[in-house]
């Protein structure tokens, strides 16, 4: 009987030692490292399963080679590093420098920006611009449902593809998990290049359950772009039941579209392994646009070397003098963001947070 105990002990050590070494080498915050070690120590088998699905530090993964990422980011944006008559307000310069230095997110002047908070207005504008496309349409969305609205947008894309316009579509595999394959296959048969982002067979049991593409980007001919929180689904227009859907989306015309194009083409390389960097996708900006709206598009991802957007929030909160108003459908902040919010509030800055009701995460203390 004693031999069985020794066997169990050896098995436990054989599992625990590599598991703990893996956690220690994962280069995470000390508190998180200790928490995972305790979970593994007291629940070794269950703890390993939890760690595989939820604990791995994906920021260290290189899903795109450094050379390809360099060509898609730095080289595609290099000519925009120096822009004539670019005036950045002094109080915004530190923040914009932060994004430029760590994300190659260059600010662009003279943009026309329209804000949509109504789904009808957004879809009408999107369909209109799709109808005006002459060279290419690049659409990147988390949800593209096969409902009445989804078919309306799909038909518009198919019409343009049949006219010879290049149409590229990326949808998230988890976001569109319930959408029938025939919906996207119909678009492929019409000549649209369609790819799903990180396909998974069982979304609820994948280690990349939160490793999804939530971007909602559309770039048309490199001259007009859309970005925001609205997916392609009927509920974003008609709401759900008696409740109206409230979200925000932007239409950008001007140099800021170059940044949206870059974000899409990075995602496209990831799903298609095709390096699209031809300058025809970055056409000259219409000289008639003189709105004087400064645009800087910042992207972030689990594989980026820096948590760009999180650092931006911290910087915004700590440099604010009067107020910071935040609106989000999900509020699960990191400790640095919470610390910055508390610090700013204690310094007398008016911090306001707008979230939907009801919420399922009432454990946060601000």
Could you describe each region identified by the protein language model?
Residues 300, 326-328:
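Thr-Gly-centered strand-to-loop micro-motif
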Residues 311, 315-318, 322, 335, ...:
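Feature representing long, continuous alpha-helical segments
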